[in-house]
Amino acid sequence: MSAIKKTFTYGRHQVTLETGEIARQASGAVVVNMDDTMVLVTVVAKNEVKPGQDFFPLTVDYQEKTYAAGRIPGGFLKRESRPSEGETLISRLIDRPIRPLFPEGFFNEVQIIATVMSSNPEVSADIPALIGASAALSLSGLPFDGPVGAARVGFINGEYVLNPTNAELKDSALDLVVAGTESAVLMVESEAMELPEDIMLGAVVFGHTQMQAAINAINELADEAGADAWDWAPPAEDTAMVDRLKALAEDGLQQAYNIKQKRARMAAVDEVRSKAFAELITADMDTVAANHVKDAFHRLEAGVVRNRILSGQPRIDGRDTRTVRPITIRTGVLPRAHGSALFTRGETQALVVTTLGTGRDEQTIDALEGSYSDRFMLHYNMPPYATGETGRVGSPKRREIGHGRLAKRALLAVLPSKEEFGYTMRVVSEITESNGSSSMASVCGGCLSLMDAGAPLKAHVAGIAMGLIKEGNRFAVLTDILGDEDHLGDMDFKVAGTENGVTALQMDIKITGITKEIMQAALTQAKEGRMHILGIMKASVSETHEMSAYAPRIIAMKINPEKIRDVIGKGGAVIRALTEETGTQIDIQEDGSVKIACTSMEAGELAKKRIEEITAEVEVGKVYEGPVIKLLDFGAIVNVLPGRDGLLHISQIAHERVNTIGDYLKEGQVVRVKILEADEKGRLRLSMKALLEAPAPTSGGEEHAS
């Protein structure tokens, strides 16, 4: 099969989709080229379902090869290692809009691998990778209800920009990625500089309209090069089993969902489930039939919850659709931490801790476009005890990395600049209880924790998770969703922002038919909830707190760049001695900017004084005090400033004649001298005599010899 190409214009970029030359043994393979950023995306699906499989095993792996940017990996092995945080986030970005488009009951293993093979530093690879994944799936013949298009939208000078370059994004008030099918938006991921809801929604609609060019190109490619459709059909529904299950479990589920407390409710649901499965799943039943029973129970449970809400009954925990759960806030929870906040909303709780550091603590990120440093980190951890379970504890999972990134996006817009606040900031959110919306609790707690640490944020930021349940023309938007409502609903979206506007928006839609009007209603209701939470946060922490006594203090100063070598000294000897003497950390930049980090201001001021002495310029005619460091036959060498010595000639020691220098000076003796001269080579001529009162003349008019 020869290579087949489809090209289309996408914003100011040319995009080419190519198949048929590379990775021909995969179920589907596409190379996407977007202005020299090239991504190879492959799809492989197993023909047989693994015995006992009861879920859809879809894996998405996005990987960046350093050769794509003409670089060799660092480290001893000189090869790519485990996925970076950025690679993990893009893997999730690809997964989220694709997963809902596979049919219920499809349990064949599917693996998508997206490999960045060429990188234009101005064109991010996430959009080409997502388009490539959609195209490869469309070619594979799998039961995939696509294709999916994807677009990045910026907002520059009051106008939407399609697929802005990385340079343009620096001037953009918005960085939004939207993915969807021809008729529906499926996923939104964004950060913004306090933009109003109508601008955010307009960006989603703009991106969805523009992505039709990508969808059309994928359809054309699939028509020409696509494989035959799989001979797969969803398993036939066993209506007799479903009816029996309803008779066994529906009333029990109705009663269970009248229980407002999560653990008691889940225990009641588990009891109903166990009794139903004991009746319907027999020992000799095969896995497929058992899975049908489990799926039917899940649908029955979802139907019970959804119908209660759509019929106007109270939600699972007794609230109406617009009420936020009770909120409590406590700051300064950890006495030795630089800043801490305990944010509790219903049965979701986050203990969020802020640590302040110096420039040396910035995170160095080795990306394809080169290394750069990040002064703000936000890490999200959710241990198994948060949901009353046991489980693995260790390195963060994809979900934790994604939630941490969302919370970070929400806070970026209100952080002080480096000039305003020279600290590195690390925020850690420990989820100690979870029943929905833990990432948004991390946003609220992160804001309060930073303020408790003394970071001068521009505004309070709150986040809220919203849900949607839709049946036909009936729909209900749910404010501050529980975990069960997230699991059983049709849309979950998280909105974070200030009183002025949105700073982060994440949306995942599981069904088609979500109109612009429904999204508008949801965003309006989310704003109400956000304003309610902001009011509680402001009442608890109205302004930034004083910095903790245990946080480092940073003193900034500027020196002549030519003096940097004097402060550092040979082999770093001077700066090493300075840090040991004062107990501080000293960072010096090439432009002469100096930052002194200390735990006590006294130590910091001492270090500053020492640096000022080292870098001070000697002034002719000025008086200095310093030790005698060496005696000579014709005078002495006196240190007037760190690194600056001068010659005190024997004739300048005293008004009378000096025959023996040792009679007047000793090594180590501190003397006051005046600078008489500094020649073009920087050599100094000193005088003690100039500071002494001249003796009165003798009666004979003669003076003592000098």
Curated annotation (Swiss-Prot):
SUPFAM superfamilies referenced in this protein's UniProt entry, alphabetically: Eukaryotic type KH-domain (KH-domain type I) (SSF54791), Nucleic acid-binding proteins (SSF50249), Ribonuclease PH domain 2-like (SSF55666), Ribosomal protein S5 domain 2-like (SSF54211)
UniProt main location, coarse: cytoplasm
Enzyme's top EC category: transferase
Keyword RNA-binding: yes
Keyword NADP: no
Alphabetical list of Pfam families matching this protein: KH_1 (PF00013), PNPase (PF03726), RNase_PH (PF01138), RNase_PH_C (PF03725), S1 (PF00575)
Source superkingdom: Bacteria
One annotated GO molecular function: polyribonucleotide nucleotidyltransferase activity
Keyword list, A-Z: Cytoplasm, Magnesium, Metal-binding, Nucleotidyltransferase, RNA-binding, Transferase
InterPro entries: ExoRNase_PH_dom1, ExoRNase_PH_dom2, ExoRNase_PH_dom2_sf, KH_dom, KH_dom_type_1, KH_dom_type_1_sf, NA-bd_OB-fold, PNPase
EC id: 2.7.7.8
Enzymatic reactions: RNA(n+1) + phosphate = RNA(n) + a ribonucleoside 5'-diphosphate
Protein function: Involved in mRNA degradation. Catalyzes the phosphorolysis of single-stranded polyribonucleotides processively in the 3'- to 5'-direction.
Similarity-based family: Belongs to the polyribonucleotide nucleotidyltransferase family.
PANTHER family, per database record: POLYRIBONUCLEOTIDE NUCLEOTIDYLTRANSFERASE, POLYRIBONUCLEOTIDE NUCLEOTIDYLTRANSFERASE 1, MITOCHONDRIAL
Annotated protein name in UniProt: Polyribonucleotide nucleotidyltransferase
Lineage: Bacteria, Pseudomonadati, Pseudomonadota, Betaproteobacteria, Nitrosomonadales
Gene (UniProt): pnp
